[in-house]
Amino acid sequence: MYCNQCQQTAKGVACTTRGVCGKTEDIQSLQEMLIYGLKGIAAYAYHCRVLGKRDEQIDAFVHEALFKTLTNVDFSTEDHWNLIMRSGMINYRAMELLQEANTEFFGDPTPTTVFTGVRKGPGILVTGHDYLDLEALLKQTEGTGVNVYTHGEMLPAHGYPKLRQYKHLVGNYGGAWQKQKTEWAEFGGPVLATTNCVLNPPESYKDRLYTTGITALDNVKHIERDDYSSIIEHAKRIGDLTERQGINIPTGFHHRAVLSLAPQIIDAVKTGKIRHFFLIGGCDGATPGRDYFTQLAEKVPKDCVILTLACGKYRFNDREFGTIEGTGIPRFLDIGQCNDAYSALQIAIALSKAFNVGVNELPLSIVFSWFEQKAVAIAYTLLALGVKNVRMGPTLPAFVSPNNWKYIQENYNWMPIGDVDEDLKAMLGN
């Protein structure tokens, strides 16, 4: 443990074995777990507010949970676990509210394919998660000759009818966040960063990087949504970007789009044409071992469906997965951003109702890649909903103490990722 939040901290530095207050390593871990989950909830609640949505129960829970972590308020292990489970349900509500806001503003996403190259003409790259920022830029660039490209978690924007209607939203350039220093340098045009994940830029593109909204970097230009003229003029000054070849990748498989195929999917499962569903998704990152998710997706049998979400999809979304034989059902379904875990859960819940079984009895395996605190909040949502047998990687969270991880293992049978072939065999029940 490492706790230095009160005046009595050991040696004026930190308590590292047991708190002067009586706090144990496991309580310190539970409080960190709770705080990191709250950060994820805050991100989704912030996006909701930007779109005019708010739920008092979310705000009230954040206040209560933070108060619980104050010095000498709560030393109960059971109470902390209850709070973490409640945080999972609060995050579920935040994701639900954000889904409502996104679809009210931009329409229900529908499946589409997105070009991954660069077209002739000036262009701006938009990264992050904020669709309202993207829409504002699209409105302000309409008729200017400046093309707009999405990056990273903005890819699902192409599925929304209100955003897709802009003809100068021409494609998606680059992959997940950790490659930005190379990809943004190569892109050549200005980049607009709306939320995470943005890194401190090298000189190669620092003068072309703009932040907006909640995002900020030292010595990088910050502009507001109501006036993007400076980045638009910058794109015009740079002029035509270097054309690049690309492929078309799929997105837009919102739960309503997927559930419109429910009769065909149910029939395909009953007739044995679909053997299993794999949800392989979450955050991407630079840590070695993330090629596990690529290998797993590539080795999933052809009679199985892969669902994905968040930037972890970039590990394999450039592959051609085709369709389930004899059905026309796509084998690869990109559900959307990390917050669209809500959509993935709606699909699982609908299937469980259709087959009259619990979610844990479905032919469904969840393989969860994580990086930051929104993924932590989603993990708590899965736990709160009682979802078991989840594989998590590439490493386990350092802030979860051995005893707390043991609790998760014993009660939910969560486990770290292992050998791809052995894991796949176990998930398929072979």
Predicted segments, located by residue:
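Metallocofactor- and cofactor-centric catalytic cores in central/energy metabolism, strongly enriched
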Residues: 1-351, 356-370, 375-379, 390-430
